[in-house]
């Protein structure tokens, strides 16, 4: 019997995966030193270094907005600017936090192709003006996977990195769904980050089986200078840090992070396949990660909502986003597809 509470509005709707839950339970025994000076935080940090095949600096934050904002603020002065896509989470969904924590670094929007920045679009913005009256570009931020579900290949990231180095720009990656990108491409995390020229990665756990927590990885040690102070000042230094870091141990040690990302991606592919022959239904973007973006009729959207389905429609008239999670059941996907077929036949 399927769980009727499973929805497709967001991969934040799902609960905690067994591996993360078990690690938290184990971390709950006895006392540990506070503020990150505990064995769980050390284990999690070492797991990241092993996974990424490099001696990176590792920090933990409560959520993605804090992780992105603090990471970007470490790369910018207040008179600098950050180049991003028009759909970037830092631009549309972080309530000005990147600007706040950087004391005013402006976000500059560049054109995209299927949600992805290109070397050409970055160059256009970075070289648009170079006078003292304009905020000086200092950082490019990529979202991997993007907000429309597209994924940067290692070659695309390397090309962007070359442009960044040429123009004196740091390269930040918002990896809220980084796991899904790795699962889709079959690439190692190293190949998608520092080996391709990424300076800082915000690795998301909340959307892939954790209750709370993001990891911030600096591949350039110099850029991490005093970052622990930024975290403390921003209220991101957990006193009982082991409960942020232990779930990472749970999902990293046995590759649960990758297993669940593959499952979420598979469910998204399944949904896309099941609705591909429905008249009037169009895929808005290629399905690469765990999201499916469909063009539906407005009456059909209303009918699906009336049936109790939850999904987002922030992408324009008739656009609907359906996100799959680490625990999405295939039968629930099929049920959604059947209802989409039914409402589209009537509307």
Feature-to-residue mapping (PLM):
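Conserved PLP-enzyme active-site core in the AAT-like
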Residues: 2-285, 289-307, 313-328, 336-346
């Amino acid at each position: 019997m399927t769980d009727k509470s499973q929805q497709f509005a967001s991969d934040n709707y799902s609960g905690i995966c067994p591996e993360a839950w078990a690690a938290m339970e184990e971390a709950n025994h006895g006392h540990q030193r506070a503020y990150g000076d505990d064995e769980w935080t050390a284990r999690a940090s070492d797991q990241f270094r092993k996974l990424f095949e490099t001696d990176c600096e590792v920090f933990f934050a409560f959520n993605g907005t804090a992780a992105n904002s603090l990471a970007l603020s470490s790369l910018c002065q207040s008179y600098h600017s950050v180049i991003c896509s028009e759909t970037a989470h830092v631009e549309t969904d972080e309530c000005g936090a990147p600007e706040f924590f950087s004391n005013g670094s402006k976000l500059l929007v560049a054109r995209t192709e299927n949600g992805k920045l290109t070397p050409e679009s970055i160059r256009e913005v970075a070289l648009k003006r170079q006078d003292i009256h304009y905020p000086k570009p200092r950082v490019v931020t990529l979202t991997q996977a993007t907000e429309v579900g597209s994924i940067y290949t290692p070659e695309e990231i390397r090309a962007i990195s070359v442009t960044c180095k040429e123009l004196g720009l740091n390269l930040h990656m918002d990896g809220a769904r980084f796991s899904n990108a790795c699962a889709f491409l079959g690439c190692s995390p190293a190949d998608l980050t520092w080996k391709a020229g990424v300076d800082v990665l915000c690795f998301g756990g909340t959307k892939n089986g954790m209750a709370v927590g993001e990891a911030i990885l600096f591949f350039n040690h110099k850029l991490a200078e005093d970052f622990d102070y930024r975290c403390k000042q921003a209220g991101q230094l957990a006193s009982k840090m082991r409960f942020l870091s232990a779930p990472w141990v749970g999902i990293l040690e046995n590759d649960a992070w990758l297993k669940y990302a593959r499952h979420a991606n598979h469910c998204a592919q399944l949904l896309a396949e099941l609705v591909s022959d429905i008249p009037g239904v169009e895929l808005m973007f290629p399905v690469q990660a765990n999201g499916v973006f469909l063009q539906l009729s407005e009456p059909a959207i209303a009918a699906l909502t009336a049936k109790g389905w939850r999904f987002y429609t922030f992408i324009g008239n008739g656009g609907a986003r359906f996100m799959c999670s680490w625990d999405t059941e295939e039968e629930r996907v099929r049920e959604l597809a059947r209802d989409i077929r039914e409402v589209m036949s009537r509307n």
